From Swiss-Prot:
Pathway: Amino-acid biosynthesis; L-methionine biosynthesis via salvage pathway; L-methionine from S-methyl-5-thio-alpha-D-ribose 1-phosphate: step 1/6. SUPFAM superfamilies: NagB/RpiA/CoA transferase-like (SSF100950). Substrate binds at residues 45-47, 85, 192, 243-244. Catalyzes the interconversion of methylthioribose-1-phosphate (MTR-1-P) into methylthioribulose-1-phosphate (MTRu-1-P). It comes from the Bacteria. This is Methylthioribose-1-phosphate isomerase. Keywords: Amino-acid biosynthesis, Isomerase, Methionine biosynthesis. The record marks 153 as: Transition state stabilizer.
Length: 343
């Protein structure tokens, strides 16, 4: 399975997801500014992976910090990383975790602080892999044997520290002996499904068929799809789900055709401070992602473009939310809160 991100003595090493599937290349970030750029430019993407990258960004930032006004330097590091992408709550969760640890060590020798932050960032990474495997185990039973699973965007090993959330459920179902295959939406405009999900599943020899986003309803109506499993970037207290743009359309089609629609995400993706998805900030990305594909224009020059990176799926379309602590069902205000407080 692909290694998405790793801490090394030379810096934070991550696979360059903008180059896949044609080129498997790795980028080494040697300071926190380079980590921030990698997150913003989607060299690394996926909510859990962004969280791990942010933790490592704080750690590497403090490695290069001087003795003077360390508090101010840590604040700047955290603020820079927090400004990279607004929707994925895991980013802020990881930054807050690292900042709290730093706060608990304020006044200790700088080398001790540096060492402890590195260790914590590595713990965040290892925890994420273990969490993803637990999500997979909890979701495997929900996947119907002998059917096709539809997924949107990429919520696999590439979107996490390893194994994946939505693709982790698929992997776990196959490991349990189920005979399933996958339909992957191409996921315009950044093509995460075509470029990343198909490539990743091919690495594991999982049977995968690529379809365009506007084909999903056709195959659901034809009875080909057993269930839909997607990831999430932020989940509100009422169960509304922010995920890659186009997810809402898939969920509506699934409801219309009686296809179960599952969301696989770690507890860290829950944002119970938000009562509904209407409060989730939606990132707007550049027009060039829509007007160009691999650097080639596909629209007339000067075309007006809107490019929201995410949409919000209302909870009424969600059959279940699969976490490492179990599966939540409606009413989500109660079930999600119960999962969060579960030891």
């Amino acid at each position: 399975m692909v290694e998405t991100i790793e801490w090394t003595p030379g810096g934070v090493v991550m696979i360059d997801q903008t180059r896949l599937p044609l080129h498997e290349e790795y980028v080494t970030c040697r300071n926190y500014e380079e980590v921030a750029t990698a997150i913003r430019d989607m060299i690394i993407r996926g909510a859990p992976a962004i969280g791990v990258a942010a933790a490592m960004g704080v750690a590497i930032g403090v490695q290069h910090a001087g003795d003077g006004d360390l508090d101010g330097q840590v604040d700047l590091i955290c603020e820079t990383l927090a400004k990279t992408r607004p929707t994925a709550v895991n980013l802020f969760w990881a930054i807050d975790r690292m900042k709290r640890l730093y706060g608990s060590m304020r006044g200790r020798p700088l080398e001790e602080i540096r060492s402890r932050l590195i260790a914590e960032a590595q713990i965040v990474r290892e925890e994420d892999i273990a969490i993803n495997r637990a999500i997979g185990r909890n979701g495997a039973a929900l996947v119907p044997d002998g059917k096709t699973v539809l997924t949107h965007c990429n919520a696999g090993a590439l979107a996490t520290a390893g194994y994946g959330t939505a693709l982790g459920v698929i992997r776990a179902a196959i490991e349990s002996g189920k005979k399933i295959d996958v339909f992957a939406d191409e996921t315009r405009p950044f093509l995460q499904g075509a470029r990343l999900t198909v490539w990743e599943l091919q690495q594991d020899s999982i049977p995968t068929t690529l379809i365009t986003d506007n084909m999903a309803g056709h195959f659901m109506k034809a009875g080909r799809i057993g269930c839909v499993v997607v990831g999430a970037d932020r989940i509100a207290a009422n169960g509304d789900v922010a995920n890659k743009v186009g997810t809402y359309s898939v969920a509506v089609l699934a409801k219309e055709n009686g296809v179960p629609f599952y969301v696989a995400a770690p507890i860290s993706t829950l944002d119970l401070t938000l009562s509904s998805g209407e409060q989730i900030p939606i990132e707007e990305r550049s027009a060039a992602e829509v007007t160009h594909v691999f650097g080639h224009a596909v629209a007339p020059a000067g075309t007006a473009v809107k490019n929201p990176a995410f949409d919000v799926t209302p909870a009424r379309y969600v059959t279940g939310i699969i976490t490492e602590k179990g599966v939540a069902h409606a009413p989500y205000e109660e079930s999600l809160k119960k999962l969060v407080t579960t030891k």
